[in-house]
Every structure is written in structure tokens, then in C-alpha cells.
Curated annotation (Swiss-Prot):
The active site is at residues 120, 135, 157. Keywords: Cytoplasm, Dipeptidase, Hydrolase, Protease, Serine protease. Belongs to the peptidase S51 family. It comes from the Bacteria. Hydrolyzes dipeptides containing N-terminal aspartate residues. May play a role in allowing the cell to use peptide aspartate to spare carbon otherwise required for the synthesis of the aspartate family of amino acids. This is Peptidase E. Its main location: cytoplasm. The gene is pepE. It catalyses: Dipeptidase E catalyzes the hydrolysis of dipeptides Asp-|-Xaa. It does not act on peptides with N-terminal Glu, Asn or Gln, nor does it cleave isoaspartyl peptides. InterPro entries: Class_I_gatase-like, Peptidase_S51, Peptidase_S51_dipeptidase-E.
């Protein structure tokens, strides 16, 4: 399988997806036809989100079509070379994808050679479940099970920092809560600017910041770029 799982879409001082474009280019391998899954978009319309994505990917020669605009979406997924899943609200993304019957076809197509690119919520969707999203559950997705393309849980936008005077839980504390009720899970705290690339069965960590791995009953483990899962 070929996956590019990004913590986020924007870095300070850079244009939207600018840091990700070289990574995408390196994994295309001649692929050009892409379907875009815009359902995580809430405060922007799916048309706006699709057009924005298509414009930024034009320099890479990628032809982007929004899945919501296609009369036969399952056929489009079957024919796609690239499946791109944008960030936003993970609960809405999963709900719409499930109700439209897209989850199994997407997973099957990626397992048979399509490149999967997802940022933030799109990275969450590639995991076994969406239980490590940071998003508010604005809709009921009728279950948390997701694509299961990547075997570990990802927490995108990971930071353990708290504003001065803030008394809420740290991100690690929230992850530890999950590991109490689901100790079988392994959670990757993927900070902004970092990513995971999967190719030929090998997952490699990239990015300038320290990534953290959390397991039940164990201390967090720090990982740096180049680590192979």
C-alpha cells in the first residue's frame, strides 16, 4: 500500500499544503487521476474545498474531482489512481463516507494500488478507528470504525502544551484515558509539520518535530524523523 498521512495542512509562513507538495510528488509514480473526499469540510462548502484542493495540486499534474460531484462514486473510486481525504471534522467525514457506502471501496482500492493522501481528519480516517481525533462530535457517525489502512491510531496536531492558567487535560492525559478503556491500542502523537509515509509495507516517520508513541502501562516513547514502524 501507498499512504501519505499528514498531521496538518498548513505551517506558519507557508501556503496551504505547501510543505506537503514535495512529499506528494515523490509518491505519485505516474499517478494523475484523483478523487477528493471533501466531507470533513463544515465551514466551507464541499465545492469550495474541492476547488481549493484542485488548484493547489495542479502544479503536480493531478486531476482532482470531488466525489460529491460524481454520479457514480463507487465506479470513480474503482478507477481512481489517487484518493485524497481532506481535513476538517472527522465525525462528519466518517458519517458521510459510511452513509454513502465509500469506506470498503476506498480501502479495497488503496490495497490494490491507489495512493491514499490524507491530512488531519483524513489521516484519522486511515486508522482502525477515529477514536484519537481532536474534533468535536458534531454528528453521530454510527460507530467509530474507519478504514483500517494504517494499523496504529494517529492523534494529529499533537501537542502537550497548555495555555498558562488552563486547567483542562493535556493531550497525553486524554490519550491515556483512551488507553485505559482500550489498552490494546497504540497511539502516535503526530505533531504539526510531521507525517507518515507508507510504501511497500514500510511506514516511515518524517518531519522536523518529535513524535510520541503511547501504549497502555508504558512511558511515552519519543521518535524522530526516519523512524520505521
Amino acid at each position: 500500500m501507498e499512504l501519505l498521512l499528514l498531521s496538518n495542512s498548513t505551517l506558519p509562513g507557508k501556503a496551504w499544503l505547501e510543505h506537503a507538495l514535495p512529499l506528494m510528488a515523490n509518491q505519485l509514480n505516474g499517478r494523475r487521476s484523483a478523487v477528493f473526499i471533501p466531507f470533513a469540510g463544515v465551514t466551507q462548502t464541499w465545492d469550495e474545498y474541492t476547488d481549493k484542493t484542485a488548484e493547489v495540486l495542479t502544479p503536480l499534474g493531478i486531476n482532482v474531482t470531488g466525489i460529491h460531484r460524481i454520479a457514480a462514486p463507487l465506479e470513480a473510486i474503482e478507477k481512481s489512481e489517487i484518493i485524497i481525504v481532506g481535513g476538517g471534522n472527522t465525525f462528519q467525514l466518517l458519517k458521510e463516507s459510511r452513509e454513502r457506502g465509500l469506506l470498503a471501496p476506498i480501502a479495497d482500492r488503496v490495497k490494490r494500488g491507489a495512493l491514499y493522501i490524507g491530512w488531519s481528519a483524513g489521516a484519522n480516517l486511515a486508522c482502525p478507528t477515529i477514536r484519537t481525533t481532536n474534533d468535536m462530535p458534531i454528528v453521530d457517525p454510527n460507530g467509530f470504525d474507519a478504514l483500517g489502512l494504517f494499523p496504529l491510531q494517529i492523534n494529529p496536531h499533537f501537542t502537550n502544551a497548555l495555555p498558562e492558567g488552563h486547567k483542562g487535560e493535556t493531550r497525553e492525559q486524554r490519550i491515556r484515558e483512551l488507553l485505559v478503556v482500550a489498552p490494546e491500542l497504540t497511539v502516535i502523537g503526530l505533531p504539526e509539520g510531521n507525517w507518515i509515509q507508507v510504501s511497500n509495507g514500510q511506514a516511515v516517520l518524517g518531519g522536523p518535530n518529535t513524535t510520541w508513541v503511547f501504549k497502555a502501562g508504558e512511558e511515552a516513547v519519543a521518535l524522530e524523523a526516519g523512524h520505521r514502524f
